[in-house]
């Protein structure tokens, strides 16, 4: 819809999709930092977001994933009188289910990517729509399982476990050693 303008905090993919970036997401990346620098970064982000919500006549705010920070930002958005939509909702079924009360207070509509999540949010009285998983549209299988197993010299039978430590360099540095150790322990069994 050409009448809709989008502005946000994001990366190159969001910008290519037509979102006017008010700040690059890299400015918000503090994975693994500790101490005063991390605290200063958090304070900066909270102040930036609070000012952002009051700076323009926004119609709505769409938060994407990252519930640790985004549920807090949603508080500022609601306080500014904005409609709040949450895409890739907090996985309350997996951990910290007590967050549902924050979601009910701070989010107007949840967009879930897993079919069973809709029932959980419906039961809690949170308006919700199942929209499907973005990877199913973005990633089309290019190889059949037999070809992949041959390419990576894997047996034709048995389970294959992928180690996916993250998308950011710091995440990979922090998580890959633990994942490799876990894989080593599994292989010994």
Predicted feature locations:
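Short hydrophobic signal-anchor/transmembrane segments that target glycosyltransferases
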Residues: 174-189
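Nucleotide-sugar donor-binding and catalytic loop/hinge architecture
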Residues: 144-162, 188
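Active-site and donor-binding regions of nucleotide-sugar-utilizing enzymes
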Residues: 1-149, 164-175
